Amino acid sequence: MASPNKAVIVPGNGGGDVATHGWYGWVKKGLEQIPGFQCLAKNMPDPITARESIWLPFMETELHCDEKTIIIGHSSGAIAAMRYAETHQVYALVLVSAYTSDLGDENERASGYFSRPWQWEKIKANCPHIVQFGSTDDPFLPWKEQQEVADRLDAKLYKFTDRGHFQNTEFHELISVVKSMLKGPE
C-alpha cells in the first residue's frame, strides 16, 4: 500500500467550527508542518445528528478518504471512520473516544451507525494500521465499549486515565502517532 499523503480529521457531532474546536485545529497545524503532507479539517454537513447517510458520502466525495489517507476520527467521527473502513480501503484509522453502541441515546440511534452489527474483519482487511486513544474517565463512554473496539480491531491502544472525552486543545501523542506512520511500520 502506498505511503499516506494526507490526514482527514472527522470531528465528533455537536457542531461548532472544526478549525477552532478542541484539538482539531491544533493537530491540523502540526501535521501540515510535515513536508508534502496535507491535513483536512472541514465542517461536516448535518453536524448535530451526524447521520451515516450524509457523513460517509461526504468522506468519500468531499474529503477523498482513500488508501493514502489517515482518518483521525473523534467520538462520532471515530464511528464514521470505522463504518467507512468497512467498505473503503484507507491507510490508517486513528480512533479517539471510540465506542460500539448507541449508548441508549436517541441522537446516536438516529445517526444510523448502530442499526446493524459491526463488520470488524472487513475494517481490518481494508485498513492495515489502526491506533486508538481512550480514557477510562470519559464521562460519555463506558471503558468497556472503548476496550471492545481495541480488542475487535487489534488496535494499538493508548489507554489514559485522565483525558476524559479528549476535549483538550492540544494532542501531542496523536501527532507523534501520525509521524510514526509516515516513517514506516510501527
UniProtKB/Swiss-Prot annotation:
<dbReference type="Pfam" id="PF06821">
    <property type="entry name" value="Ser_hydrolase"/>
</dbReference>
<dbReference type="InterPro" id="IPR010662">
    <property type="entry name" value="Hydrolase_RBBP9/YdeN"/>
</dbReference>
<comment type="similarity">
    <text>Belongs to the RBBP9 family.</text>
</comment>
<dbReference type="InterPro" id="IPR052581">
    <property type="entry name" value="RBBP9"/>
</dbReference>
<feature type="active site" description="Charge relay system">
    <location>
        <position position="165"/>
    </location>
</feature>
<protein>
    <recommendedName>
        <fullName>Serine hydrolase RBBP9</fullName>
        <ecNumber>3.1.-.-</ecNumber>
    </recommendedName>
</protein>
<dbReference type="GO" id="GO:0010628">
    <property type="term" value="P:positive regulation of gene expression"/>
</dbReference>
<feature type="active site" description="Charge relay system">
    <location>
        <position position="75"/>
    </location>
</feature>
<comment type="subunit">
    <text>Interacts with RB1; the interaction disrupts RB1 binding to E2F1. Interacts with RBL1 and RBL2.</text>
</comment>
<dbReference type="GO" id="GO:0017171">
    <property type="term" value="F:serine hydrolase activity"/>
</dbReference>
<feature type="region of interest" description="Involved in binding to RB1">
    <location>
        <begin position="63"/>
        <end position="67"/>
    </location>
</feature>
<keyword id="KW-0378">Hydrolase</keyword>
<feature type="region of interest" description="Retinoblastoma protein binding">
    <location>
        <begin position="56"/>
        <end position="70"/>
    </location>
</feature>
<dbReference type="GO" id="GO:0009624">
    <property type="term" value="P:response to nematode"/>
</dbReference>
<dbReference type="GO" id="GO:0005654">
    <property type="term" value="C:nucleoplasm"/>
</dbReference>
<feature type="active site" description="Charge relay system">
    <location>
        <position position="138"/>
    </location>
</feature>
<dbReference type="InterPro" id="IPR029058">
    <property type="entry name" value="AB_hydrolase_fold"/>
</dbReference>
<dbReference type="GO" id="GO:0060510">
    <property type="term" value="P:type II pneumocyte differentiation"/>
</dbReference>
<comment type="function">
    <text>Serine hydrolase. Catalyzes the hydrolytic activation of amino acid ester of the antiviral prodrug valacyclovir to its corresponding active drug, acyclovir. May negatively regulate basal or autocrine TGF-beta signaling by suppressing SMAD2-SMAD3 phosphorylation. May play a role in the transformation process due to its capacity to confer resistance to the growth-inhibitory effects of TGF-beta through interaction with RB1 and the subsequent displacement of E2F1.</text>
</comment>
